[in-house]
Amino acid sequence: MLYSLLYGYFNINLFQYLTFRAGLGFFIAFFLTLFLMPKFILWAKAKKANQPISSFVPSHQNKKDTPTMGGIVFVFATIVASVLCASLSNLYVLLGIIVLVGFSFVGFRDDYTKINQQNNAGMSAKMKFGMLFILSLIVSVLLSLKGLDTFLYAPFLKNPLFEMPTMLAVGFWVLVFLSTSNAVNLTDGLDGLASVPSIFTLLSLSIFVYVAGNAEFSKYLLYPKVIDVGELFVISLALVGSLFGFLWYNCNPASVFMGDSGSLAIGGFIAYNAIVSHNEILLVLMGSIFVIETLSVILQVGSYKTRKKRLFLMAPIHHHFEQKGWAENKVIVRFWIISMLSNLVALLSLKVC
């Protein structure tokens, strides 16, 4: 909107630069989140919109009055910044907004159910999975109709492994959406644990998206060119900015939780960025913390069902370390370090080989 007005009508050349608009979107989303979040916290406390804490985590019972659904605020701030700074005629931008709104809506339904029923279960797994599946399928089909190529790339290799048939590609993309959104959701168990690794992952993916959308950079780095995808860089940095604003209130001890309305939106948007920039496999490295958290749950459940023994004191694995006596801040910061290093290694793939 602002982009179309200032560049399209008034020909202010500064707005033709993607990096300027992305930076502007970052700060708009950041300050808007900073401004709106205290108001949301006051409203949520008045409405007693706090998520019940699981009885299996007694050390967290002091957080039972902390309001949740803060994700609504930073998703809203991201969309406002994107509408102002991005080109809304770009299909990748529109699909990115659909992903944020759609996944956040599913999370909101889950958060609302938890608050309304005053339990930690939320929606039924079948209902939640079904809504996420339908949304993922719609976006994946639209990407296919848009003409996004279906080559599968491996980290540090410049040539694709093979070209997936359309149906296989759509199914694979749906899997990426579902696994990533739920992985971020599982990670959101400690103050700031999900938001900072999400920031690192989004920053890495935003670089890949920028390179993919830039003819000169993609040619120099032998990176697959994706026409028009560079505009997604604006939304990615806007989401990073809003997450920094959210972290202002979510750092330990948290004044607000993002809830599923935030974690599912982040996970869905991370998956979307990975798909359009051909980083579905590299996402395992960039989102290493999310992968570790998810694997810990899968292994814990699998071990208990087959051997009646638990591999960890508690899953997801961040609770295991808490049970071992690690302070919450120690778990959080060490996981941040792992995430940062993983993303630095992932970025090396741009130039290596």
Curated annotation (Swiss-Prot):
The keyword Plastid does not apply. The keyword Phosphoprotein does not apply. It is found in: Cell inner membrane. Its cofactor is Mg(2+). GO terms for biological process: cell division; cell wall organization; peptidoglycan biosynthetic process; regulation of cell shape. It is a multi-pass membrane protein. Keywords: Cell cycle, Cell division, Cell inner membrane, Cell membrane, Cell shape, Cell wall biogenesis/degradation, Magnesium, Membrane, Metal-binding, Peptidoglycan synthesis, Transferase, Transmembrane, Transmembrane helix. One of its GO terms (molecular function) is UDP-N-acetylmuramoyl-L-alanyl-D-glutamyl-meso-2,6-diaminopimelyl-D-alanyl-D-alanine:undecaprenyl-phosphate transferase activity. GO terms for cellular component: plasma membrane. Pathway: Cell wall biogenesis; peptidoglycan biosynthesis. The chain crosses the membrane at residues 24-44, 66-86, 88-108, 129-149, 160-180, 192-212, 229-249, 256-276, 281-301, 330-350. NCBIfam families: mraY. Belongs to the glycosyltransferase 4 family. MraY subfamily. This is Phospho-N-acetylmuramoyl-pentapeptide-transferase. The gene is mraY.
